[in-house]
Amino acid sequence: MKALFFTRMFTLMVSCLMYLSIVKEDNWFGYVFIAAGAAMYAANHVLLTKETNAIWFCLIDIAIGFSFGFIFPGTGLFIIMLCPVAVAFFLRGFPKRTAWSVLCLSSILFLTVLIRTYAMFGNEFVIDHLTSMTFVVFCGVVGKLIRKLLDAQDTAKQQFQELTESHLALSAAHQELHLYAKQVEELTAIYERNRMAREIHDTVGHKMTALLVQLQLLREWQKRDSQKADETVGVCETLAREALDDVRLSVRTLQTENDPSLIESLKQLTEDFCKNAGVTTEFAVSGDPAIIPLSLHPTLIRTVQEALTNAKRHGGAAACSIQLACTTDSISLVIKDDGKGNPEAALGFGLLNMKKRAAEHGGMIRFESERDQGFTVNAEFSLANKKWSFGPVQQKESLS
C-alpha cells in the first residue's frame, strides 16, 4: 500500500510539471491553475487516507483531472492523471450505488472535454482521448481487484484469528473435560467404596455384632446352664450362616451390577436365590426397561436382593413374585411373598437401608404386611419429578 501511495503522488506531480512545459510564458492563468491543481492534489492525497469524507476527496481529484483536460484541450496528459485517481477510487471500495453515480458523473465530464476538444481541434485529439481513456478503465479494474484481494486477506486474517481463538477455547474445554472426567472417576470410586462399606456395615456388620453378643452370652451360659449354652450355640451358627449368605449374595449382586442389562441381572439374581434358598420365584416385566436410568440399576437390584432375603429369612416364604413396570413417567417395582407376615414389625437395618437407597434417587418405598398374608414391598421412582415421602409400615391386620 505504501508503494501505491508514493507512486500515485509521483504520477500526479510529474503530470503537473509536464503541463508547465506546454503553457505559454504570458499565460499566467495557466501557471496559477497548474500550481493550484498540484497543491490540491497534494492535500487530497493526504486527506484521502482518512475514512471520513473519502468520497468527496475522490470527487475533487476527478474534478481536478477533467479541469486540466478542459483548460488544456490540446493534450491528453489529464488522462494520465485520472489513472491513479481511478485506482484510488476503486481501492476505497465504495458501495455500488455510489460507484455508478461517480462513473456517470465522470462520463459527463469526459464528454464535455471531448466536445470542447472537437470544437477546437476537430477529430485530431478526440480519437486519442478515447483510446487513452481505456487505460483509465484498466486502472479502475486493477483497483477493484486490489480491493478484493485486500478484503480476502482481511477475511483470512479474521478467520485465522477466530480459528485460533476456537482452538484455544477447545483446548481449554478439553483440559476442563479431562479434569472433570478425573474428578468423576475419583468420586465414583469414593461412592463405590462408601456404598460397599455401607452394605457390609448394614448386613454383615449387623450379623457379626449380634454374633459377638451371643458369644459373650454363651460364655456366661456355659458356667450356669448347659442347655441355654447349647441353644446359644445354635443361634451363633444361624447368625454365622446368615452372615456368610449375605456375603455371597452381596458378591453376586456386585457382579450383576456390572452387567449392562438390568433385566438379565435381575433374572440371574432371582434364579440364584431360587436355587440357594429353595423359594419359588416369579419375575415379570411390563413396559420398556431401556428407559430406566443406569444410575438406578444398582438400587433396583439391591432392593430385590434385600426383599428376597427378608422373605426367606424372616417370613419363611415358599414363593415370591417380582413385578417391574416401566412407563415414560415412572418405574414401579413390587416384590411380594407368601410368608407369615408381621404388621407390627419395626423397620430393621435392611428395610431402612432400602428406603435410604430409594430416597437418594427421589423414590418412595412402602411396606405392606398382613398377618399370614405375606410381605409386600412397593417401590416407586418418578422419571419426570422427584418426590420424597416418609411413613411407617402400613398395617392391614383383619379382626378375625
From Swiss-Prot:
Protein name as annotated: Sensor histidine kinase LnrJ
One GO CC term on file: plasma membrane
Class of enzymatic activity (EC top level): transferase
Domain Histidine kinase: 190-385
Pfam families linked: HATPase_c (PF02518), HisKA_3 (PF07730)
Entry comment on modification after translation: Autophosphorylated.
Organism listed in the record: Bacillus subtilis (strain 168)
Alphabetical UniProt keywords: ATP-binding, Cell membrane, Kinase, Membrane, Nucleotide-binding, Phosphoprotein, Transferase, Transmembrane, Transmembrane helix, Two-component regulatory system
Function: Required for resistance to linearmycins, a family of antibiotic-specialized metabolites produced by some streptomycetes. Member of the two-component regulatory system LnrJ/LnrK, which induces expression of the LnrLMN ABC transporter in response to linearmycins and other polyenes. Acts as a specific sensor for linearmycin, either directly through binding or indirectly through membrane perturbation. Probably activates LnrK by phosphorylation. May also promote biofilm formation.
Keyword Flavoprotein appears in the UniProt entry: no
